[in-house]
């Protein structure tokens, strides 16, 4: 049994009984902090959004629609807890560390190998096609130094994108469980990215539903730290 299997096994009884985790709008000190993420390529992002739309037929409304194509992502590392106003000096340090780490890796490829349930979400499961993703994760932790405190001692051992975060009752729990179970090994293709992004998240509740929109504070292409180092981030000078 792998980690994705264990998550499915853990989540199933919680969802069936209505005891699943529920997201709420972020507050200072909570989830959805400044993070380093990878985005799927556009074609893959559209496939993941389609999967989210199908999930919603069973989950119902009121959940966080994190699988929309311009929001879906793979988290490399969370860097702090949520705060409404970002610390510009911290952002400069995070960006510099991300650039240095990216210099040591090439494009990161992920095979999207199926869906699973977690206590608070529906996930797309991914397997790295080589060691670039793991190397970037390790290099980033090293380059952050003291700024690596948020995930100190934590080793992310799976790659995933959450396409729906539960935030309300699930309309058809049994139907959702069965639907995901039938797609545990559904191939959603391969995605590759040569760009890492430093992002913060903004909560929206509007005509498109409840969203967590990433705002790009900085980005860097793999192996190109030396070429980008002099440019500005959205939060200020590097």
Task: Give residue spans per PLM region.
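Histidine-dependent nucleotide/RNA phosphoesterase domain, centered on the 2H-phosphoesterase fold
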Residues: 1-238
